[in-house]
Amino acid sequence: YFLGNKSAGNQLPRRFRDVFAGAADGGEKTEFDEVKQDENVHWTGKEDSDKISPMDITKEWTRTKGIKGTVIERQEYAINGTTYKVDGRHVILQPTKQEKEVAAILSGEYGKTVEFVPQVLFPQGIQTPDYLIDGERFDLKCLKSTGRNLIYNMVSKKKMQSPNFIFDITNCPLSESEIERQIKDVYASIHTKFIKKIVVMKEGKIKRVYDK
């Protein structure tokens, strides 16, 4: 439809007419938030962040601090009714050094039961999380660069992999206030509604834990 075609525009749902009308008049966009990064424009579909704010569950999530947890290496993992067993070829279990360090901290300092999850190389396209933490899927992300939408870009396409994330910001040049802003934007975006928990770690300590 073209904005100049009045009859065609009237056939659109009201909410889209309002958006187009606002754009044509130079007004503010009502449903989308345009974000520009490195000369590339994309739409995050951000909702009103004043209405959608994550809960701070840091105290609750870390109440087991000082209690000894456990680290387990799972030798199999089930997805959609199919069990994939570690064979060293198609299914492997090779956690990185940083994944091991974070697991040791979560179990040793915060009493968590941390399970390393095998990686499925074949069949292709099978996404698995890095961990099961107290039975919940978690993926580890180490932030080392900058960008207005750094966190959004890291998690927006991980719906099938995990709804929960750990962000290690030890080597991230962004300020903690900017990281917090980006996390709140992720919770506000209509494209990342699958996000549940986000754990922020720095220098081996949990800084903040968010929940939807």
Identify what each model region corresponds to:
Residues 117-119, 141, 201-203:
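Conserved beta-strand termini and adjacent loop/short-helix elements that scaffold enzyme active sites
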Residues 1-95, 104-105, 113:
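Low-complexity, glycine/serine/proline-rich disordered segments
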Residues 34, 131-142:
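Conserved catalytic cores of phosphodiester-cleaving nucleases, focusing on short active-site segments
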Residues 203-212:
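Glycine-rich, aromatic-bearing surface loops/beta-hairpins
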Residues 142-198:
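Catalytic cores of nucleic-acid endonucleases
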Residues 109-123, 129-130:
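A short acidic/basic microdomain associated with nuclease active sites
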